[in-house]
Amino acid sequence: GREIAMTQRSASLMRELGLWQRIHDTDPAALSPLRDAKVLNGASPFSMMIGHTLTNRSELGWLVSNHLIRRAAFAEVDAAAKAHGRITLMTGQPITRVLSQGAAAAGSAPAAGSAGSAAGTGDMTEVLLADGTTHRARLLVAADSRFSPTRRAMGVGASMHDFGRTMLVCQMTHEVPHNHVAWEWFDYGQTLALLPMNDDPVTGEHRASTVLTLPHQRIEPLLTMDEEAFGEEMSRRYHGRLGKMKLTSTRHNYPLVGVMPHRLVARRFACVGDAAVGMHPVTAHGFNFGLLSVNTLADELRLAHASGRDIGSPDLLARYERRHMLATRPLYEVTRLIATLYTTEAAPAKLLRNAALHLGQRFTPFRKLVAASLTGSL
């Protein structure tokens, strides 16, 4: 349903995990380079440009379809399960209740992969699944969305910021080439984004993932509008800068709610992915932070397992929480402020928006900092 803007660091992790090669083998054209990015405000053609020339890379990042990432991840886990026999996939069975923490019922077998822990065999977390079965493990990890029911079941609260907006996402072809430049356009009354995809390998048409953000009630009519009228409407909303536009995919809508958990860990429990931080998409860091959380936690688990230490120890989980909070909390707060400022329509806010954009363009060190955050040079 949507394209993922991926930093160079995330692309590197994807390669290490074997996912990049799987996607490339399936559809090489699905890996689209994101060379530059520009930020626009209102109807002005002026933009703040974050170019790859500010870095030592030929692109800032990459654009990959979310469904291809999911498919590759499933295939990689399935292959590992068949190769090692120590992984069990139980799909479509959400956790309905966390039954216990700490000493669990005697006689129950530990979950797969719990061997090698220094903790006693009774020190486990037990969960009840929708099919009525119970399972025990030394560590329970929630990766079930920013509104994580597992996080809630563990008694971990979260601060939520509802932006009162919904974004509509779809793929479209367009006449004017995008030159692999991403757009973030804070127009008046709407926010637009363009994520550049590779040209259609069959027709040669220019393609992009387009994102339109509006108040909830104004998105609904666009979801059911006929395709020709929708193309005309989107061309108008992009002020004709992409020429004629044509819908080439289904349309998807997502309410914009930022979520920051009060904690990332509890007793024998950790949050990763969107369950660890739910970002506003304006900085395109949601997936990247999710992948970072998995890598950070995995680092801690590997070190503990290699030295025979408990993979669910309070010290290990505290280190993970500190590392990931430090990596994500500052940008979460900055993103929330940016999204609020650039959707405020009052006259003083419009002046401030314009001034900030011009200042950012003139202050090259700032643009280099943004570019470095995308390429992983920080």
Model regions and ranges:
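Conserved N-terminal helical subregion
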Residues: I23-T26, L31-A153, H161-T166
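C-terminal helical "tail/cap" subdomain of flavin- and related membrane-associated enzymes
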Residues: D299-L378
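FAD-binding beta-loop-beta segment adjacent to the flavin cofactor pocket
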Residues: Y254-C271, R329-P330, T340-L341, A346-P348
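Conserved FAD/dinucleotide-binding core of flavoprotein oxidoreductases
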Residues: D187-Y254
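Glycine-rich FAD cofactor-binding loop and adjacent beta-loop-alpha segment at the N-terminus
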Residues: G1-L34
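Active-site metal-binding loops of divalent metal-dependent hydrolases
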Residues: S145, F269, A275
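Central beta-strand plus flanking loop segment that forms part of the substrate or channel wall
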Residues: S12, G18-L19, F147-W183, Q190-L192, ...
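Glycine-rich phosphate/pyrophosphate-binding beta-alpha loops
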Residues: T191-A193, V257-M260, A276-N288, L326, ...
